[in-house]
């Protein structure tokens, strides 16, 4: 759901930074 999308986006950002 939306929560999963937010969590996934957070993981992507963490991986980039």
Curated annotation (Swiss-Prot):
Broad class of where this protein is predominantly found: secreted
Tissue specificity as recorded in UniProt: Expressed by the skin glands.
Top-level division of the source organism's lineage: Eukaryota
GO (cellular component) term, any one: extracellular region
Keywords: Amidation, Secreted
Location relative to the cell: Secreted
Positions where Valine amide occurs in the chain: 17
UniProt name for this protein: Caerulein precursor fragment-related peptide BM4
């Amino acid at each position: 759901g939306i929560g999963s999308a937010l969590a996934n986006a957070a993981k992507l950002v963490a991986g980039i930074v």
